[in-house]
Amino acid sequence: MTVPARGFLLLRGRLGRVPALGRSTAPPVRAPGGPRSAFRGFRSSGVRHEAVIISGTEMAKHIQKEIKQGVESWISLGNRRPHLSIILVGDNPASHTYVRNKIRAASAVGICSELILKPKDVSQEELLDITDQLNMDPRVSGILVQLPLPDHVDERMICNGIAPEKDVDGFHIINIGRLCLDQHSLIPATASAVWEIITRTGIQTFGKNVVVAGRSKNVGMPIAMLLHTDGEHERPGGDATVTIAHRYTPKEQLKTHTQLADVIIVAAGIPKLITSDMVKEGAAVIDVGINYVHDPVTGKTKLVGDVDFEAVKKKAGFITPVPGGVGPMTVAMLLKNTLLAAKKIIY
């Protein structure tokens, strides 16, 4: 079954805000017939059913509605409309698709956007000059450089060239550092998307075992930081016991960890890395993977994640699909960061 859109609103309405992921004394998912029978759609007793499929598309629609209301409220107070500047280098089809989606989503919530398109042979110096100009432009709330960049450009230098307070991707060294110190920051959008999926779905992490497969500085590491840190700190964390796996983790060792995990988050870029024998009954599986593979049935290329979805959904308690899971949520959290940057809440 797929979680309906209203389920997210009901969950928040019943439990209130859950900043510390699982600090509620009452579990968010009740067995049928309990005092909160409205939650029976999330679990069932008796015969084992397939996992609840978490619709990131539907959840993102609700978040975008919240952002749109926030933008309208901000403007009604006489403030400038939030403005997102996107720098796109080269002609990578996937990057162009991602940027179009971001521009379309920004428009839908009332955020102005502009696209600065540069050829793949653009110099690093020119890109830094552009970020400097945008940093000083008072009308620009947020700046995003679509990755990856060409090999001759130092991505870290470009990301650090964006002012931290306008770094809506959350990749600046100051934002990453503040995240690691449990301080408020602009959080990388994909990590924030995973966090939001967990909290809005009511997946428990307090004292639970979590495996994060993938240690990239923009995805895996920020996700692990959010989930293992103290729920009582300035920027509340998930209070989970987190294991990080990576390319040098032997498959059998990874399997040992995932079989014990209550939550598995996969961001490795390897199709079908997680199979059903690696997942314990009722675990939550969040698939961040983006892979394009050949479909032997249609003869075309299709998008898949890192999880063997059809097999794992028969065993997991919750699962996100690809497409339609973390992807739409990542765009929504980018827009949320843009509004936060415009309101100067963090910096």
Curated annotation (Swiss-Prot):
Where does the chain bind substrate? Y98, V99, R100, N101, K102, V145, Q146, L147, P323, G324, G325, V326, G327
Source domain of life is Eukaryota
Copy the pathway line from the protein's UniProt record.
One-carbon metabolism; tetrahydrofolate interconversion
GO BP, one example? Answer: methionine biosynthetic process
Q: What is its EC number?
A: 1.5.1.15, 1.5.1.5, 3.5.4.9
Q: Which cysteines are joined by disulfide bonds?
A: none
Question: Which terms are listed as keywords in the entry?
Answer: Amino-acid biosynthesis, Histidine biosynthesis, Hydrolase, Magnesium, Membrane, Methionine biosynthesis, Mitochondrion, Mitochondrion inner membrane, Multifunctional enzyme, NAD, One-carbon metabolism, Oxidoreductase, Purine biosynthesis
Where found in the cell?
Answer: Mitochondrion inner membrane
Coiled coil feature spans: none
> What cellular component terms from Gene Ontology apply here?
mitochondrial inner membrane
Residues bound to NAD(+) are: G214, R215, S216, R247
Q: Name one GO molecular function term.
A: methylenetetrahydrofolate dehydrogenase (NAD+) activity
Q: Which cofactor does it need?
A: Mg(2+)
Q: How does it sit in the membrane?
A: Peripheral membrane protein
Task: Identify one Pfam family in the record.
Answer: THF_DHG_CYH_C
Its catalytic activity? (6R)-5,10-methylene-5,6,7,8-tetrahydrofolate + NAD(+) = (6R)-5,10-methenyltetrahydrofolate + NADH; (6R)-5,10-methenyltetrahydrofolate + H2O = (6R)-10-formyltetrahydrofolate + H(+); (6R)-5,10-methylene-5,6,7,8-tetrahydrofolate + NADP(+) = (6R)-5,10-methenyltetrahydrofolate + NADPH
The family line of this record is: Belongs to the tetrahydrofolate dehydrogenase/cyclohydrolase family.
UniProt cross-references to HAMAP family, sorted A to Z: THF_DHG_CYH (MF_01576)
As for what it does, the entry says: Bifunctional mitochondrial folate-interconverting enzyme that has both NAD/NADP-dependent methylenetetrahydrofolate dehydrogenase and methenyltetrahydrofolate cyclohydrolase activities.
Protein name per Swiss-Prot or TrEMBL: Bifunctional methylenetetrahydrofolate dehydrogenase/cyclohydrolase 2, mitochondrial
Which organism is this protein's natural source? Callithrix jacchus
